[in-house]
Amino acid sequence: MKPLLLLAMAGLLACNDSGTDSGMDSGISQRRIFVTDTIQNGNFGGTAGADELCASQAAAARLQGEFKAWLSTISSPVSGRLTQSSVPYVLVDGTLIANDWNDLVDGSIFAPINLDANQQVRSGDVWTGTLPDGLPYMNDDCEGFTSDSAGIALCGTTASMNANWTANATPPCSTELRLYCIEQ
């Protein structure tokens, strides 16, 4: 009976304060964030297409690891798609953005997310579909980011360190914007 109790206690110790498994960060001291160097309208194939774009730009810049877009649809929030990390989120040059996931979704960040995968400064708005708490904007999402003609979607801005980094405006889906990409 005692060995089972020890195993149960060890399992409890493997969880961080938020109740998520801290093993997801094993061997990783930080997760990198960049903004795409290209712009696209609201039709980029949904979250899968956005993730593909992030992976492609990371690979072209020789960044190791898996990168996904900071992009929510009404049915698929970033809080369910992305790793909720307990390590810091940083720009590709090492600039601190947030101490961990909870800090990332608290309504403010430490620096603007304005560097692309090659450390070039980029400006402008960014498709997110994501509120500051990591939940999806429920009013519209360019039909799951598969349409450039129907509706609007939430965007953030690369210039902001407050909640506007992810929730700044709701432009038409025909607008060409960037994406944020986060290492998983």
Where are these regions (language model features)?
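C-terminal motif of bacterial Sec signal peptides marking the signal peptidase cleavage site
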Residues: 11-14
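Sec-dependent signal peptide recognition
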Residues: 1-8
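Secreted/extracellular ectodomain signature
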Residues: 16-184
